[in-house]
Amino acid sequence: MSIRIEIGERYVVTSDSFQFILHEKKRAESGKNAGQEWLAVVGYYPKLSQLVSGLMHHDILTGSAKSFADLNVQVEQLSKRCSEAFGSYGR
């Protein structure tokens, strides 16, 4: 059984029989697929807890926080999106 869980507008979690896969949504800017959405792999994780840690790490490093207060807000927002996404999965 594979899963597909969207986390907010930016991330998607999928799985295969061995691992969880974190993807970031991207949009092609040029070429014949301009404007189409595609999923870029951020990482492969054998445990869901490792995926959540990898997601937080990636979001922090690619985010726009300029202070610890900004970073706190960013982490809280992502935590809320994760809670909503994982809480609604399977309903």
Curated annotation (Swiss-Prot):
Q: Per the record, a Pfam family?
A: DUF5405
InterPro entries reported for this sequence = DUF5405 (IPR035404)
* Family that this chain belongs to: To phage 186 CP83.
The molecule here is called Uncharacterized 10.2 kDa protein in GpA 5'region
Species annotation:
Escherichia phage P2
